[in-house]
Amino acid sequence: GILPMAVDLKNTAVLQIGKSSQGALFHQQLKKYMGADRIVANPDSIASLTKRLMKYDRVIVTIYTEKYAAYQGMLSSLAAKKPVAYVYFTLLKNVYKKGNAWKKAAAVVLGHSDSEDVQRFVADVMVGREKATGKISVEVKDYRLPGEGVDLEQTKEYRPEDYGMDSSVLSKIDEVALEGIKAKAYPGCQVLILKDGAPVYDKCFGTFTYEDERKVTPDDLYDIASLTKTT
C-alpha cells in the first residue's frame, strides 16, 4: 500500500479541510521527513483547487471537520488519477457514514482527535517512524467492518544527526555498558536515549542474571515503578 510513505518522493500535497490554524502542526511534523506543500481548502474555489492538485504525485487529505461534503466529488475524481490518503483528526462518530468517499482512497487513517500529540504521532506513522496496530470498533458504511484495519510496522531508522546528536559520541555508550557487565555491576541492561521523542540510541547488552543465558532484548518488559528513586 501507500503507507508507510516513501520520503524520497518530493511532489506531495497536504490538503487541509477545516480550520487553517489546526493543520500547521501535522504539516510541520511531516516536513521533518519529506517534502510536502500545505494547501488549505476553500469550498468557493474547488475548480482552481482541483487544477492545482493535479500537478502533485500524491495527496494527503487532512480533515478537521465533519462538514466536507462539498469536496467529496472532487476528491473521488482526484483519487481515480493519483494516490490519495485521507487522515481524519475528528471524532469517529463523524466518519461512520463516509465509506463511499473512501472507496478509491489509497489509505484511510483515523486519528480521532486533533490534539498535538496525535497529530505528531500520525505524521510519524505515515512515514514509518512509528507503528500502528489499531482496529476500527464499528462498521463504516460500505467500507469496513468492526475489527478491521492494517498493522503498520516501524520501518525507518532514527539517525542521531537528524536530531542534533553525534553517532560517534553515542557509540561510546557501548564501551561503558560492556565495562559495567565485565565489572559485574549488572548482568545486562538496555540503554534507551530519546531526543524530542525519537529513539536515537536503543541497544541491549548482556543477560538477565549472571547464571541465565537469555539475552536482554528490546521486547523485554520492565517494572519501572521506582525509576524516580534511581535517577
Roles of regions detected by a PLM:
Residues 133-135, 159-160, 180, 224, ...:
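Residue-level signal for functionally critical sites in structured catalytic/ligand-binding pockets
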Residues 1-166:
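Preference for extracellular/luminal or secreted protein segments
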Residues 25, 73, 117, 121, ...:
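Extracytoplasmic/secreted proteins, especially bacterial periplasmic and envelope-associated proteins
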Residues 162-224:
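Short, conserved catalytic-motif segment at the N-terminal edge
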Residues 8-9, 13-15, 138, 142, ...:
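A generic structural micro-environment signature
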